[in-house]
């Protein structure tokens, strides 16, 4: 196996790791109602409890600015932990000084398959967990639910429409431990500013965002929670 393609695949999954890390920019959002806001800390805990029970999601991740260890512009894909860990999607990333657009990836039967050049067949890069354990994203102890449960100084500071659904915007700081469990590539050594967009009525997490350094952030838009994800294992 060639080193350069494998490095690019590792970069892609460092991205997916941080995707687990969180949310905002390229979805449609706008300020909405000026109704009284709920308690931000309570809303985060309610959303954390709901997110713990989820086993599948569609995610759209974008990076604003430059985040060290994360050479990605966008990742768009589906992920499930049941009945087995599986994922598929595409990513735009920078590797070897060049942009790789719409790189396809599939995780099936524990292995990572990827095609870094459009039109190429998917190649088997071996055990996906050796690059990034995607099950961590939906794991209640290491993933999105754990991030929501580890906000400090949480404050609900407004409402926004996220892709047509009204959400309460909650800002605060996420513990370094929670950040590093879901996104080791960020190598946080202190609390990281974070924002979560959560529906008030059923506590669904619609977006999340981490800002490791001022002006540089990772944003993930989440949808289709609980929808069945069917991933076909590529032919050998």
UniProtKB/Swiss-Prot annotation:
CC terms in the record's Gene Ontology section: extracellular region; plasma membrane
GO process annotations (BP): lipid transport; response to antibiotic
Major localisation: membrane
Coiled-coil intervals, chain numbering: none
Lipid sites, type S-diacylglycerol cysteine: 26
Induction: Part of the lrpG-MSMEG_3069/MSMEI_2992 operon.
KO phenotype (gene knockout): A single lprG deletion shows reduced incorporation of trehalose monomycolate analog O-AlkTMM and increased incorporation of analog N-AlkTMM. Double deletions of the lprG-MSMEG_3069/MSMEI_2992 operon are more sensitive to ethidium bromide; restoration of wild-type growth is conferred by the M.tuberculosis operon. Cells display abnormal colony morphology and are defective for sliding motility under carbon-limiting conditions.
Subunit field text: Interacts with itself, Ag85A (MSMEG_6398), LppI (MSMEG_3851) and LppK (MSMEG_3904) in vivo.
Entry similarity comment: Belongs to the LppX/LprAFG lipoprotein family.
Protein name: Lipoarabinomannan carrier protein LprG
Lineage: Bacteria, Bacillati, Actinomycetota, Actinomycetes, Mycobacteriales
